Amino acid sequence: QEDFLAAVAERFDVAAWGDPGCGEPGADAFWPREKGTFGMFLGGRWYCLRVKPEFQSSDPVKGLDVSILQDQLLGPVLGVGDPRTDKRIDFIGGIRGLKELERRVSEDMEAAFSMYPTSIEELLAVADAGLLMPPKSTWFEPKLRSGLFIHRLG
């Protein structure tokens, strides 16, 4: 765990839950409040991660938090090449909350990460650039029942 935290600290400022600037009074888990910040649950404890400036990007796709997590932590530190196919990764939708992340780590995973949500402005910037959003970078509620919108005419 120490080696992993040291590897993460090469690309992120890392603070343990309860350290100055990491956590809100009365809260027991870290939900990122701004772009470029991540929560990490590891070894029964929450950590706050903030990407170091030299690893930020103005590219509309590379600058997304989901890309930063993949390009700066999951790929280089954990060896996750393709998050869509790597069996070591699972995705938990936003409505299930931080307690679900904690539960999964206590049962069958080693670490969990929470991210600040992708904004509509970021999504539009990617579309305007003619690029594609990375896998699992968006979460919208409510979900359409069939995935299609059907409207009866007449």
What are these regions (language model features)?
Residues 1-154:
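Surface-exposed, charge/polar-rich loops and edge strands
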